[in-house]
């Protein structure tokens, strides 16, 4: 699959914005964009984000190595200052590297395809994100994080085992 990116925070002026990038080969750009060689995964790193040696912003960066990531792929997150200008420059940078803008639900779709989550969890996550009341949070959260998800996973495992035998 291609390398995709998305703004994970609203596209409005704020203190910070977060971009998520995922896909095979995305880590190949870390040295070029951030000036880091072989950074450790799962550590928050402070570094300069550049486009062709032109400084854009001092950002936070976290790398995730697949399959130990949400999508199951190599990925990284960029924590930048939340000005609209910075967001625009980051979008331009990612576009110039050939990254594709992720469609809505793309990261969850990749997590499902890579067996990181099941269908119930994918649907429950959507409900959880869309929840507008505390009742909706509790109901969708129970489905996503609670007993229902575990019971469905156990049931699915039993079906798979019975099909094998």
Ranges and model annotations:
Residues 144, 148-162:
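Amphipathic alpha-helical coiled-coil segments
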């Amino acid at each position: 699959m291609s390398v995709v990116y998305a703004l994970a925070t609203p596209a409005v002026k704020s203190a910070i914005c977060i971009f998520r990038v995922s896909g095979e080969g995305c880590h190949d750009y870390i040295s070029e964009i951030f000036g880091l060689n072989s950074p450790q995964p799962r550590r928050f790193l402070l570094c300069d984000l550049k486009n062709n040696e032109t400084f854009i912003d001092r950002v936070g960066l976290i790398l995730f190595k697949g399959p130990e990531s949400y999508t199951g792929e190599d990925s990284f997150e960029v924590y930048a200052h939340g000005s609209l200008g910075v967001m625009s420059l980051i979008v331009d940078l990612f576009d110039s590297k050939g990254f594709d803008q992720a469609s809505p639900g793309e990261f969850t779709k990749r997590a499902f395809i890579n067996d990181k989550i099941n269908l119930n969890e994918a649907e429950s996550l959507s409900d959880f994100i869309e929840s507008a009341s505390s009742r909706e949070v509790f109901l969708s959260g129970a489905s996503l994080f609670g007993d229902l998800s575990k019971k469905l996973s156990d049931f699915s495992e039993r079906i798979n085992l019975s099909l094998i035998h």
